């Protein structure tokens, strides 16, 4: 979650400070942010069933 927040803040700073011609960097950061978010969701999706097997209710 910390990485997600850092990437969002960096994207906002770049969006405010760069010219439209430099928007490629923002696009790259946005793609990295989406990839990290999807990986985190997949990790949580995999961890929950394993956690339920180890620690039954």
UniProtKB/Swiss-Prot annotation:
Induction: In response to mating.
Record GO biological process: defense response to Gram-positive bacterium; innate immune response; male-specific antibacterial humoral response
GO cellular component: extracellular region
Entry-linked Pfam families: Cecropin
Origin superkingdom: Eukaryota
Subcellular location, principal: secreted
Known tissue expression: Ejaculatory duct of adult males.
Signal peptide stretch: 1-23
Keywords, alphabetical: Antibiotic, Antimicrobial, Immunity, Innate immunity, Secreted, Signal
Protein localization: Secreted
Role description: Male-specific peptide with moderate activity against Gram-positive bacteria.
Protein family (similarity comment): Belongs to the andropin family.
Name of the protein in question: Andropin
Underlying gene: Anp
């Amino acid at each position: 979650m910390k990485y997600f927040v850092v990437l969002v803040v960096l994207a906002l700073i770049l969006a405010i400070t760069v010219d439209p011609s430099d928007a490629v960097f923002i696009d790259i950061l946005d793609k990295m942010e989406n990839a990290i978010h999807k990986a985190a969701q997949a990790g949580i999706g995999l961890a929950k069933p394993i956690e339920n097997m180890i620690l039954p209710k």
